Amino acid sequence: MAPPRHARLVAATIAVLLCHLPRSAASPSWSDAAVSPPSPSPQLCPMMQQRSVLPPRVSELPASPFTAKAAFVRYWNRKVHSNRPHPAFFFAKLSPLSAPDAAAFSTLAAAGQLGSRIRAFCAAASLLCPTTPGSSWSKSSSDGDGAAAAAAPAGGGGGGGGGGDGGAAPFKNYENGNFSSYGNSGGGGADQFAVYSSGQSNGGGGGGGGVDSFRRYGKGSQGRNDSFTSYEAGGNVGTSSFTSYNGDATGGAGGFSSYAGDANTVAVSFGNYDHTGNGRSREFSEYTQDANTGEESFAAYGKTANGAAESFRTYGNHSNSIATGFDNYGDRANGAADAFSSYGASGNTPENTFKSYASGSNAGVDDFKGYRDDANVGNDSFTSYASNANGAAAGFESYGKSVNPGSVTFKGYGLGSNPNHRIGFARYSGDNTTFKAYSNDGVEFKEYQNMSKMEVSKIEAAARRPPLRWSPEPGKFFRERDLVAGNRMPMPDIADRTPPRAFLPRDIAAKIPFDAAAVSALFGAAPGTAMRQVVSSTVAECARPPSRGETKRCATSAEDVVDFAVEMLGDNVVARATESTAGGGGDVRLGRVAGVPAGGNVTRSVSCHQSLFPYLVYYCHSVPTVRVYEADILAVDSNQKINHGVAICHLDTSDWSPNHGAFIALGGKPGEMEVCHWIFQGDMTWTVAN
């Protein structure tokens, strides 16, 4: 019996589609298989001999029409009418959720029960989620290079024993995102932890973009010497927390060499160092040295310790646009000898807060050498120094000796009812300064200078300016005149070092309140953790009012990104990004340079930048009066093409801060010059199509 007419029509339609699919193009379900896709039969394709038909785009042929990715393909085709190929860099970020998973998680989100399956959700949707402590690492389970812990279940190893038998417990490398415990309750011997999350480019727990957590090191140990060499150094987007280091320890000596040094965009916290320790000498060498942008905090150092000799060498020095907070140093300690060498020195536009130093201590010898010296503008406050101390001998050498004026406040120095102390303050200087209160008994105040009342020439100020270690990387900003064929110029490292994540389908993203508390609760980001800081920072930036002439939106789904671009520019749009990271970190030569749209006229664009969040969130803003360029990037020695870059030139910089990195790198002032930069990996710019 002949098949029904509608069945014949369906079969004919399938045959035509197969004819239009070239042999080299495979659907996603075939691309993972070990066999080649079936070729259409010549008998089914008489029209192939008569005319050539453009093949459909691969992204239009998903394995299942019900997946989140397939739904977005249809959405794009309805909204964007520029008839351009789908941008591969953008479509690679789409949700990998299968149709059943997307439906199940959407139902849970609608019922407010997504948290009950959060681990499965994170894994299936390719999200960034805090790790959960797994099995403990011990000396017997590792050869010292971290291999055993790295192979432990997701969430990182513990370190319960840490060589509690009195021997040395070296631990050289650890690259996962969570470490529960190391060297607790050990007796005698020495602990050594060399490297934790050092400068990985990206991935789940690396210093390049991981969310690292170290919970406890050496708690309750007796007579053990310990050292921690490096924690999340050299990374990009450092997001880490260290909860406790040698709490309740007795005897021995401790050292922490470096924490989040040379990091970019930090959100780091250190909870407790040698809390209630007894008779220990310890040193913390560097904390977020040479960091660029972000927030950092240190909760307590040597609090309620007994007979301790403590030193903290540098905190946030040579950093750019860092908001720092140090809550507690040596408070209520007994017989302590404390030294803090430098805090926020040579920083650019810092926001520094130091809340308490040696308050309520007994018979302490305290020394603080420098706070925000040689810094450039910014706002700083120091709340309390040796307040309510008994028998204290304290010295504070320098506060607020800045290169350029900032707002600095010192609220209390040596205050309290007990006059049995000897305290000296060597120098307090700066513009816009206030010193609210200090004890009149037993306190020697040598010098207070208000720089606005002093005649300091620009030449003298420039002469004492230190080298700008926080200057932007060469090539990060440049002038429009540099975009000419044949020009040799430095290319910055444009690699995306944030952890890999995917968009959520809009159907799910819309059911998650874009609120710091709600997102943190859902993904298990506890207060005080790095993930909580990251979430709060992103939500706050999205809530910031736009600048003059700027229209901004935080897009929590791929559909939101498309909607904003179409709303700003119309439906004839194209998304562009720099093709790869080739050439970054060295000199390159420019090949063909072309303005987009054609002619390089002044235009309006939409730029979208990744924000650090559990799932992909883009900060998109419509920027008026720009020019956008495409350029072939060539190797200097061979003139061979190695990359294809996209650059944007901002023609109106009048609302930019005078301390913006572009003016530090190029000179000039806001409104007096244009500033250009490459579109970094992971970011994108939208313009009207040619």
UniProtKB/Swiss-Prot annotation:
Record's keyword annotation contains Glycoprotein: yes
Keyword Iron: no
Pfam family for this entry, one: BURP
Residue span of region Disordered: 134-163, 201-232
Glycosites: 178, 225, 317, 379, 432, 450, 601
Ranges of Low complexity composition bias in the record: 135-153
Signal sequence annotation: 1-26
Composition-biased stretches (Gly residues): 154-163, 201-211
Tissue expression summary: Expressed in panicles.
Domain BURP, chain residue ranges per copy: 477-689
Keywords: Glycoprotein, Signal
Protein name per the record: BURP domain-containing protein 14
Organism in which the protein naturally occurs: Oryza sativa subsp. japonica (Rice)
Name of encoding gene: BURP14
